[in-house]
Structure formats: C-alpha cells, structure tokens
From Swiss-Prot:
Record-annotated membrane-spanning stretches: none
Subcellular location: Nucleus; Cytoplasm; Cytoplasm, P-body
GO biological process: deadenylation-dependent decapping of nuclear-transcribed mRNA; mRNA processing; RNA splicing
SMART domains documented for this protein: Sm
GO molecular function: mRNA 3'-UTR AU-rich region binding; mRNA binding; poly(U) RNA binding; RNA stem-loop binding
Region feature (Confers RNA-binding specificity): 129-140
Gene Ontology cellular-component annotations: cytoplasm; cytosol; Lsm1-7-Pat1 complex; nucleus; P-body; ribonucleoprotein complex
Free-text function comment from the UniProt entry: Component of the cytoplasmic LSM1-LSM7 complex which is involved in mRNA degradation by activating the decapping step. The LSM1-LSM7 complex loads onto the 3'-end of single stranded RNA.
Entry-linked CDD domains: LSm1
Biological classification of the source: Eukaryota, Fungi, Dikarya, Ascomycota, Taphrinomycotina
Residue span(s) of domain Sm: 11-86
Stated name of the protein: LSM1-LSM7 complex subunit lsm1
Length: 140
C-alpha cells in the first residue's frame, strides 16, 4: 500500500459517531465524571447526554446525582469512552453506595487535601531548582 492510499485513523469529533445512542462516561476538566447516553454532538465535540448522572467517588464509596439531559462544551471534555455495562456493574458492586449529599462534602475535603499536597510538592520542587507549572516564573 503506497502512502497516498494509506488509511489514516479518523481523530476529529466525527469519530464520536460510533458512540451515539450508547452509554458513555465523560470526564471533565474540573474532575466531574458524567455517565449518560450520548444523543448528539457537533463539530466542536459539544455533547448532549441523556439520562445523565454525575458520579462522585470517595475512597471505597460512590454516590450518584441525577442530572437528566446535560449539555457539555467540547473544550471541557478530557476523556470520553463507552461503558461496558457488565464491567461497570462488577466494578461498582465492590464499592459502597452512599447518598451524594453525604459524599459531596467528603469529596470537597479530599480535593482540598490533594491541592494542598500539590502546592507543598511544588514548593519543594521549586526550592531544589525545578520550575512549577503555572508559577510566576513559568514563561510558557
């Protein structure tokens, strides 16, 4: 096969067509995890999900918040993938389901601890000569 006829994988938003009407998980830039049925998308990878839930994980617990129809701006999508329903069930049954109202404060606390650890690690790395992303001396 010569270079002119070589098959190139389709990596634009058009590659989402295989996921339409399937259950997907979408991870957003802010860390939210959305699970729903992908109903539509456009050339900017803006997504429309139906029967959407936001799933919160904390340690060995999880909680779901019903979000219904959810529109996601494409630039906020970090990851999108089809869910294997059997594997999802097997994975979730190893966790304890909790009311999302109880998990939300715990998730916020975990997130703050994570940010604090990242800041401390950044300070240490800066003290030994490394540049920290987003720091005042980061010129990129």
């Amino acid at each position: 096969m010569n270079q002119a006829t070589q098959i190139i994988p389709f990596t634009t938003s058009g590659s989402l067509v295989d996921y339409v009407d399937r259950k997907v998980i979408v991870v957003l830039r802010d860390g939210k995890k959305l699970i729903g049925i992908l109903r539509s998308f456009d050339q900017f990878a803006n997504l429309m999900l139906q029967y959407t839930i936001e799933r919160i994980y904390v340690d060995d617990m999880y909680g779901d918040i019903d979000r219904g129809v959810y529109i996601v701006r494409g630039e906020n999508v970090v990851l999108l993938g089809e869910l294997d329903l059997d594997k999802e069930y097997d994975a979730v049954k190893q966790l304890r389901r909790m009311p999302a109202e109880e998990l939300y404060p715990l998730a916020k606390l975990h997130e703050e601890e994570k940010k604090k650890n990242i800041r401390e690690k950044g300070k240490y790395l800066h003290s030994v000569g490394f540049s920290v992303d987003g720091g005042h001396d980061d010129l990129y």
